[in-house]
Amino acid sequence: MYKRQADTIGRAVAEKYHLHFMDREAIAASAKEAGCYDEYEEFYSERPVNSLLYSIVMETEEDNVLHDTPGRALTFIDRLPLEDGCEGYVIQGRCANFAFQGRDDVVSVFLTANDAFCVDTVADTHGVSVRKAKTVVRETNDNRKTYHKYYTGQEWGQAENYDLCLNVAKLGVDGVIAMIDSFIQNRK
């Protein structure tokens, strides 16, 4: 869900565990430095997927070549030098749950919240009307849902695709951070 405090939560977890936080901008900048941005520009920029192209692609075989894109597009992250005492990365979005699935050194988290929470956050953060905020939240969520399905074949936000799914509206930012911390400390 759009505007569910992912930046704030991701940065706090990164700081606590001495990790670099990588959002869309940081991933794109690092991909440019690594020389792989041009090959996966649409993936890095999270451009809305063309609905006609999406329909054609989804009608083809299940193991679509596009489903390899997140893994290929994010491989450079494992080769980035770790600086400032950091021990790894918190990656926001970019189908990272899919790209890094099955790894013991990865925890994938999906943050959710009800529409009212997201709309209020957008309206407050960007100083727009509730009506405009509703449109922005709906369109952004629809684009992300389509983007995730297009590149992974998975439903965005489905619990089985993540280690943790947490509701920011119910837990608050501090509660979500505490739950992530507890999961990391107690996982086997």
Give short role names for the model-derived ranges.
Residues 49-56, 67, 130-174:
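Small-molecule kinase domains that catalyze NTP-dependent phosphoryl transfer to phosphate-bearing small molecules
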Residues 19-32:
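Short beta-strand-centered segment that lines the nucleotide-binding/catalytic pocket of NTP-utilizing
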Residues 31-87:
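ATP-dependent small-molecule kinase phosphotransfer cores
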Residues 7-19:
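A conserved segment at the C-terminal end of the G1
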Residues 102-140:
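Conserved phosphate-donor/acceptor-positioning beta-strand/loop module used by diverse small-molecule
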Residues 1-5:
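Conserved small/polar residues in nucleotide/adenosyl-binding loops
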Residues 94, 98, 102, 110-116, ...:
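Long, contiguous binding/interaction regions
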Residues 80, 84, 89, 93-102:
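RNA pseudouridine synthases
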